[in-house]
Amino acid sequence: MKKYRLIAFSLLLFLFCSCGQEKIENSGNEGLVPAVPSGIVLTEAGNDFLSFSWEASENATSYAWKLLKGMTLVKDGSSTECAVNVNGLEEGCSYSFAVRACRGEKLSAYSPLFEATTLKSEGGENPNPGPEPGPEPIEDVYEKMMIPAAEEDGIARAFPGAEGGGMYVTGGRGGKVYHVTTLEDSSSEGSFRYAVNQKGPRTIVFDVAGTITLNSPLQIKNGDLTIAGQTAPGDGICIKGRYTNITANNIIIRFIRFRLGDEDPNVSDSDDAIWGRYCNDIILDHCSMSWCIDECASFYANENFTMQWCILAESLRSSVHSKGDHGYGGIWGGSNASFHHNMLAHHDSRNPRFDHPHIYEDHNTVPNRGVIDYRNNVVYDWGSNSSYGGEGYGAGKGTGINMVGNCYKPGPSSTDRKYFMDAYGVYAKCSSCGSNIEEGYPLMYMSDNLHSKYADISADNALGIYWHNGEAHANYGITADKPFAVKGPSGESCKVTTHSSSQTLRQVCDWAGASLSRDAVDRRVAEHALNGSGKIIDCVSSTSGKVSVADEYGFTWPLLRASDEQKAIAATDSDGDGIPDYYEALFGLDSKDANDAKSISLDKNGRYTNLEMYLHYLVKEIVAGGNEGGSYQTLD
């Protein structure tokens, strides 16, 4: 058997894997969730085997690993050492390896996929190769889909794992499929902008990986749309250069990065990475937003809205904004609006800013202002302020804010803020009326919120409200004794998986953002939040006297790539129905029948089309990992 041994194999094992020859000792930290393994290296490769090692993870007692071909599981196993040898593989074949750390029932997220290829025989490639064989159809397809057990109630969500006020959005269900085949920003077919600008129910899938630099703002003005970022091969998709604005109803956006940046000379004061208001039925899931001029992601005045499992990080504090220092997280609000399992990190303020009536175009007719459910979010390393505002939430029947299970953790940039909410009863900046306006304090339901610095307000959340304008305003000193109900568009009960505040930081750091293949930005921000490091950023590129991404971290825009095999799998879709031939074979579908993507044959409960089941299959482990350890609750 031919073998290939990497140079300094023993040295690598010593440097990267000091635990490779010893069992992991029990450190006594049984209750701690171990860190995600890092430092994966290929230590040896042969015709039919691959050997991997990795750095020891803090608090780990063992490791679980898996090897995939494409997205199909080939081998898996466990080890008490930081190394594994995987045998019985095909020669000259590309594989993806991932490993997670374990401590009893406590599991980290899987590491990013590490690509490796077995060697070919001395004779080289077969001069007359036959067609590449497709995968064997998997048995028990429905069980392999890992639909969350709590969702086996016969009710269709926007997708398996969709929760909160936007959980019943339908997006592009049953509609046309558009393939993104180029990273160029144009109005031509094959571009992302072209697909977004089409009308009618539609789903956008990606045959390419990389960064799309917008030449002008991207307006999502035609609804009934699903943007399935998880279909992109390899490292996925990033949108940069100009802002994205949602002005349409019935929108699903998943696994996309929106990193605005300050390099385009046309960016302006009001530019967010992505934002939207005055719309209905929107859900953003596992997206990453950063490097904005104004806010990373502002969504308010929307009805039946969810932002879940997103990372909003590193707004630019001292970039091109005409007011000088800025750099904010977001303005959040709405009616039946859910914000859960998100991270706000390294923002000077608006972490978030709960909206007020005078932010609307006509504050005398305030649309879509009702119940906000703010749950299991992480607020880390705020600058001048953390969460504040909310004027008038509680002034009308059925309005209020649920604050449940959130984690507030100061960082190196943080001023001392001994509260979860700086509640406002007066709006004090009304340029059109010239005086302060009484709105009343927000009425809030507070439960199980955690401040890492102040145990007293963690024990009694009512002490964690700072009444900004003093006593002489409605709702002063009052908190709700039960949570406010969140309802769907037809009055249906909305549901959400809730974790304890002590779980929130780890769950969000492990699973939030465009986490199918995390880029260096999200990995860095998650590490900052876990270990208490990092800082607020002024700008992207090196600028004298300012804190830049380039100077602090030695890079700016992560290079997003895909292997040839990953690109081939994503792009080979003979019938153009959005399900690549590889997965049609895997699921026992027909790659020459475009209609089977719209059919409902894979879901035994008749809820999701085959295309939707495929979209879930790509991220099923992420959905399961995020839900793990939580309680599925009805918001009523």
Could you describe each region identified by the protein language model?
Residues I212-N336:
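Right-handed parallel beta-helix
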Residues R353, H358, V371-F555:
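Extracellular beta-rich repeat passengers
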Residues R157-I204:
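Acidic Gly/Asp/Thr-rich repetitive segments characteristic of extracellular carbohydrate-active
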Residues G88-K106:
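Beta-strand-rich modules
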Residues I24-N59, E91, A109-G124:
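Pro/Thr/Ser/Gly-rich low-complexity, intrinsically disordered linker/stalk tracts
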Residues T556-D636:
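Extracellular calcium-associated, cysteine-rich motifs in secreted modular proteins
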